[in-house]
Amino acid sequence: MTEQRPLTIALVAGETSGDILGAGLIRALKERVPNARFVGVAGPRMQAEGCEAWYEMEELAVMGIVEVLGRLRRLLHIRADLTKRFGELKPDVFVGIDAPDFNIILEGNLKKQGIKTIHYVSPSVWAWRQKRVFKIGRATDLVLAFLPFEKAFYDKYNVPCRFIGHTMADAMPLDPDKNSARDVLGIPYDAHCLALLPGSRGAEVEMLSADFLKTAQLLRQTYPDLEIVVPLVNAKRREQFERIKAAVAPDLSVHLLDGMGREAMVASDAALLASGTAALECMLAKCPMVVGYRMKPFTFWLAKRLVKTDYVSLPNLLAGRELVKELLQEECEPQKLAAALLPLLANGKTSHAMHDTFRELHQQIRCNADEQAAQAVLELAQ
């Protein structure tokens, strides 16, 4: 930052979640430095906050090996061009938002040119391919981490890291309104309610839906009034789920929802879900849960050898113990899933204790992440 020009921040976001984070960061920085300039790779939200887009975010938003290989030449061209243009611009700080396969190499290129670099959102280095931490350490001046155990991991390897809390924890209330959520979904206040969330990817929905539906059938025998809500992320997943349901449980009445995962969690007495971000969101919704997950046998065999953590779900990683039951692979079958869910639907001591711990964990990661991230950027820009 010099007298001649405003604070200049370069950013690269590669997908919608990064665009949301980038927009929140830009908003928080503009409150402190109104004339700051923002340039880079941005989605519509970042652009709405005033970020000048040298490339559209969609250019980087490719998933799957085949898709990446098909776009590889273009991706390499974009990275080389950004390395050159950011090198000429000399921004006060570069912030790579998630998209580690693209951003960490770019961060390393820029750091060699004397540009300060931040990687916002830690890759899951604490879980697998842990040696990536050394590459991240060489490429960045600072990592911004959502979760406290991530910072503890970086500290172990002397890689500068700041725990800023989780934006989702900031966005969700400490005490969600269950009755309001039930009003929205048309669920009676006095009914038992179960949310089924079989994942957002096609492979997950294919692997888990049948067992989740059979579990719901078993639970309905104990709770005849059981309302079952199934939020699905898009029309393709809904169509896939409906096909599986027609084959497995055609007579089971359920509420199929387009999106509305958060409302379903808040409204429910218990949830059965695939692991991933949904488990964190469910914890923040204060909905007691069971995690069920299944993958192809070879993939599971490989994962067991690569993954270095005792648990797969974020609530358990945050708690440092099995707070939430995880039933994986052969264990992920209807009888065991139903047995784990029954005490949660009873809404007694087990679910109350889980709810209280969820609230404590929510408070731990509710730190106003946008503000914390902005503060970290400004400190590095000094």
UniProtKB/Swiss-Prot annotation:
Can you name this protein? Lipid-A-disaccharide synthase
Pfam family name, one: LpxB
User: Can you tell me which residues the record assigns to a coiled coil?
Assistant: none
* Enzyme Commission numbers on file: 2.4.1.182
Query: So which domain of life are we looking at?
Result: Bacteria
Which NCBIfam families does this UniProt record tie to the protein? lpxB
Query: Which reaction(s) are listed as its catalytic activity?
Result: 2-N,3-O-bis[(3R)-3-hydroxytetradecanoyl]-alpha-D-glucosaminyl 1-phosphate + UDP-2-N,3-O-bis[(3R)-3-hydroxytetradecanoyl]-alpha-D-glucosamine = lipid A disaccharide (E. coli) + UDP + H(+); a lipid X + a UDP-2-N,3-O-bis[(3R)-3-hydroxyacyl]-alpha-D-glucosamine = a lipid A disaccharide + UDP + H(+)
Native species of this protein?
A: Escherichia coli O157:H7
Tell whether Lipid metabolism is among the UniProt keywords: yes
Check the record and name the InterPro entries matching this protein: Glyco_trans_19
Family listed: Belongs to the LpxB family.
What biological function has been recorded for the protein in this entry?
Answer: Condensation of UDP-2,3-diacylglucosamine and 2,3-diacylglucosamine-1-phosphate to form lipid A disaccharide, a precursor of lipid A, a phosphorylated glycolipid that anchors the lipopolysaccharide to the outer membrane of the cell.
Write out the GO biological process terms: lipid A biosynthetic process
Please give an example of a GO cellular component term from this record. Answer: membrane
Q: List the disulfide bonds.
A: none
Q: Which gene encodes it?
A: lpxB
